[in-house]
Amino acid sequence: FFFLGDFNEIEIQNVLESFGFKGREGDVKVQYCQPYSNILQEGMIRKNVGQSIVELGYHCPSEYGDEQHLPMIVMNGLLGGFAHSKLFTNVRENAGLAYTISSQLDLFSGLLRMYAGIDRENRNQARKMMNNQLIDLKKGYFTEFELEQTKEMIRRSLLLSQDNQGSLIERAYQNSLLGKSSADFKSWIEKLEQVDKDAICRAANNVKLQAIYFMEGIE
C-alpha cells in the first residue's frame, strides 16, 4: 500500500490491520522482453468507422534503468513524443498524412510503438514516411536545437511530475518492485544533459520493426 498526503498514520495502520492481510512473497516479474524475430508480423481488420489507423511496433532491447534508458527516452521524444517531434512535424503537418500521430516507448515490455489516424488511401505512404522518421534518427538527421528542445520538454515533464500524486506513487511502486531508489531530480537532469547525438543514434539503431497493424475504416 502507498499513501500520500495529510493523514493519520495510526488510523491508517489500524484500518489495514482490520483487513487481515498477510504478507506474501512472490517472484514478481515487471520486465518483459519478447525475443526479436526476423519474421515481420502483419495484421489488418476492417471496422465501420470513418478514420483508419496504422500502427508500427518495434522491438526495443533496452530495459528500465539500464544505460540505454535515457537515450531511448530522448530518442522517442525526438521521434513522436512531443508537438515538435518528427512524426508530428513531417508526417502530419508538412505531408498532411495523419489526423493524429505519436510514438510511445515502454521500457518494461521492450516496445516502441508508432500510431497514426489516417485516411485509408494513405496507408502505404503514411507507413513508409513514419518508418523513415526513425531511419533519420538512426542516421543522426536531427539538429542540436531539436535535441535541446526535446530535453527541455522532458525536464518540464519531470518537474511537473514532482507535484503529481499519481506520478509519485507510481515511482515509489516501481522502486519497490525493482529494488532501486529514484535518483534525485538534480542527478537525473545531469544524466539527461549527458545524452548526446551519438547516444541517440546508438539507441535508435537498436530498434527494429517487428509488427505492422492496420485498421481500415470502411464507413
Each model region followed by its residue ranges:
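Short, conserved, surface-exposed binding loops centered on an aromatic residue
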Residues: 45-48, 90, 103-106
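His/Glu-based metal-binding/catalytic segments typifying zinc-dependent metallopeptidases
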Residues: 26-86, 215
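Charge-rich, well-structured scaffold segments of protease-associated domains
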Residues: 1-28, 63, 71, 93-219
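M16/MPP (pitrilysin/insulinase) zinc-metallopeptidase core fold and M16-derived inactive scaffolds
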Residues: 78-96, 108
